[in-house]
Design a protein with these regions (language model features):
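Charge-rich interaction surfaces and accessory domains that mediate macromolecular binding and assembly
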Residues: 1-93, 105-108, 120, 149, ...
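Catalytic micro-motifs at enzyme active sites that drive phosphoryl/nucleotidyl and oxygen chemistry
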Residues: 77-81, 103, 132-140
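Glycine-rich phosphate/pyrophosphate-binding loops
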Residues: 111-125
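Glycine-rich loops and low-complexity Gly/Arg-rich segments
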Residues: 114-117, 140, 175-177
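Extended charged low-complexity segments that act as oligomerization/scaffolding linkers
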Residues: 125-152
Length: 249
């Protein structure tokens, strides 16, 4: 009962802060944003670490989501006035794999201690000017936005700009890798089919080709994370020897 009351109080605080700081926005959109923010990951640690912080920072995250075009990456770092060694990192970007893992590993490698992390994934509806008008399961273009709010400590006196830039760079790499991943999986399937067509002409190599096909199937079935690959063409050389040439693209 006590836990439920605290959750209700926290939800009311966040929604009240959102409506106070974002009065021009749809109450329904703010209410749904508040619900999803609190339900994705328990917010107890954030509230315990910085009492009264959640409502104000929720409004900051909402603004970042709104100010970041749906297909771009937004990063903002806010240092806490009363505890300058602590800060809240906000990010907004198209949903993909490895976002949270990348941020956690990066902050840990830089020597920062994560105190709390919230990670809502939202479907966002916007008007012609890009303003958020609705949040739900299937609104807007249907694409999902992944947002994070991370409270951490250990920030140096002048580290905001460099950290923001590095977070944006890392998330850009994550997006490239995960976007290319699907294309590389499709290419693995294409290569497998190309090998199938070779079996007729190279019947003495069928066992070897079959083994390669099985390996490609194993990769495609989620046993490997594609980060990149190269293709080569084997061409006749001027001296009669075959040459290997890297294929562009």
């Amino acid at each position: 009962m006590e836990r439920a009351r605290k959750d209700d109080d926290r939800a009311s605080e966040v929604l009240g802060a959102l409506r106070s700081q974002l009065p021009e926005h749809s109450p329904d959109a703010l209410s749904e944003f508040s619900r999803r923010l609190l339900s994705r990951v328990p917010s107890d640690r954030l509230e315990e670490a910085e009492p009264g912080l959640l409502g104000e920072q929720a409004a900051r995250l909402f603004r970042l989501i709104e100010d970041t075009p749906a297909d771009e990456i937004g990063v903002e770092l806010h240092r806490l006035t009363n505890r300058p060694h602590r800060a809240v990192l906000f990010t907004s970007m198209p949903d993909c794999a490895f976002i949270v893992e990348t941020l956690q590993e990066m902050l840990a490698a830089e020597g920062y201690a994560i105190l709390a992390l919230l990670h809502p994934i939202l479907s966002v509806g916007r008007d012609a000017d890009g303003r958020v008008t609705a949040i739900g399961d299937r609104v807007g273009s249907g694409s999902r936005t992944s947002a994070t709010m991370i409270l951490f400590e250990g920030l140096e006196s002048e580290g905001e700009a460099d950290l923001e830039a590095e977070v944006a760079r890392r998330l850009g790499q994550v997006r490239l890798a995960t976007t290319d991943f699907r294309l590389m999986v499709e290419d693995a399937a294409r290569i497998r089919e190309d090998l199938e067509s070779l079996k007729t002409d190279l019947d003495w190599k069928v066992p070897e080709l079959q083994e390669i096909q099985e390996f490609l199937e194993w990769l495609r079935d989620g046993n490997f994370v594609f980060l990149g690959y190269r293709e080569y063409d084997i061409l006749p050389g001027d001296d009669g020897e075959r040459q290997v040439q890297l294929r562009r693209g």
